[in-house]
A protein has these predicted regions:
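A short, aliphatic-rich beta-strand micro-motif
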Residues: 125-134, 138
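GAF sensory/regulatory domain recognition
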Residues: 53-56, 65-90
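Signal-transmission linkers at sensory-effector interfaces
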Residues: 1-46, 57, 172-179
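Acidic/proline- and glycine-rich, intrinsically disordered low-complexity segments
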Residues: 75-77, 86-110
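Short beta-strand-to-loop transition segments that serve as allosteric relay/switch motifs
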Residues: 142-152
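Short loop/turn motifs at secondary-structure junctions and domain boundaries
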Residues: 118-124, 154
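Amphipathic alpha-helical coiled-coil segments that mediate homodimerization
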Residues: 30-38, 43-62, 66, 96-99, ...
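Amphipathic alpha-helical "output/dimerization" segments
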Residues: 6, 134, 153-174
């Protein structure tokens, strides 16, 4: 009888794994880590480094770029990149990139898992376009390029992390307005 009570109190690790509880905690920890890293960035350079760390360690790509919005010219200019050829991806013209319009409205855009669709007019696979909001307005867009080979696509937890990037990475592009 005592043994039966104990099994109700403490589930086995296998049972927790089966029900998804361990995965949920892992996902929450990733989202928390991303938010904490961005909020504790000490300056603009550290905030940009935080974006790189989050993209590489939590989402699964070492090819990431940040483009600042030039509203007057309807273009996005490469502001910072890691693992991306800056000569190949220096300017994004909004009129030639229909998916960018959604990002410039403040909505992240994701490539479907195992899809050949590309989010930008480039030979390099683009998996996400994540707006960086400053005072609720897109000031820049994070472009997540090729994922690690073991990742089939952007997972639900990755979308949550991208939401954190969208709302907390403003310091990387507007260091004096976003704190």
């Amino acid at each position: 009888m005592f043994r039966g009570c104990m099994s109700n109190i403490s589930d086995s690790p296998a049972e927790l794994e089966r029900t998804g509880s361990i995965r949920d905690v892992g996902s929450q920890a990733k989202v928390y880590a991303a938010r904490l890293r961005l909020q504790n960035a000490i300056d603009q350079a550290d905030a940009l480094d935080a974006i790189r760390e989050i993209a590489g360690n939590l989402i699964g790509t070492e090819e990431v770029a940040v483009y600042k919005v030039d509203k007057k010219r309807s273009e996005l200019w490469l502001y910072w990149a890691f693992g991306v050829d800056p000569n190949k991806h220096s300017v994004l013209v909004v009129s030639r990139e229909p998916k960018l319009k959604q990002a410039l409205k403040g909505k992240a855009v994701y490539r479907l898992k195992l899809s050949n669709e590309n989010l930008l007019c480039t030979d390099d696979p683009v998996n996400a376009l994540v707006p960086i909001l400053v005072d609720g307005v897109p000031a820049a867009v994070i472009v997540l390029f090729r994922l690690f080979p073991h990742k089939p696509g952007i997972e639900p937890v990755d979308r949550e992390i991208c939401e954190v990037l969208s709302n907390c990475a403003g310091r990387a592009v507007e260091p004096y307005r976003s704190r």
